[in-house]
Amino acid sequence: MHAVLLDFNGTMFFDTRFHMEAWSEIYHELHPEDPNPLDPKLICGPCNESIIQNMAPWLNADERKQCSERKEELYRRMCRRNPDSLHLVAGAEKLMQGLHERGIPFILASASIKANVDFYFDSFPIGKWLKKEDVVYDDGTYADKGEMHLEAARRLNVPFSECMVIEDSVAAITLAKRNGAGQIVAIGEKADGSDLIQLGAA
């Protein structure tokens, strides 16, 4: 592989529970009549715009944006309330240093919004290896994570077919495979990743 495209949430930083708690609060504000817990499959992978459209199709564009910003504020607050969990996954720094030493270009392609990217650069030592301005994030111009992968490869000037994609969600891995990623590596918080392997991840 000639380049590596790194996801962040759920791969470099195990934060699924914080996202889940924040989305759950948003969901039950929008659906106070529903006592059931939020299905994790509804929020893992798609960008905020898609999640909110599915969750509350009656909201207009401005309301969806406000909803997205509120969800991320809740998420960051939950992260700060749990400082013991606010660290990179074991091996993440070693991976980035190893890629740097070998001259293999790598980049973050995250479904996070800009405010979260700023939060990550403030909270983790990733600035040692990555430039914030190079990060591909959810700025509202990408239809899905697959488009983010392709943009990340373009920024590195490497064909997507020669890129390794490191992801944790079924949706993102499915898109990476469909778009012809050279290699897909699945990393996740759960020990059993058989569902991701079946999709073509290593």
Residue ranges of predicted features:
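A short, structured active-site edge motif that brings together acidic residues
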Residues: 39-44, 69, 128-143
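Conserved Rossmann-like nucleotide-cofactor binding loop
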Residues: 11, 18, 114-115, 171, ...
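Conserved Lys-Pro-Asp/Glu-containing loop-to-beta segment of HAD-superfamily phosphomonoesterases
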Residues: 143-170
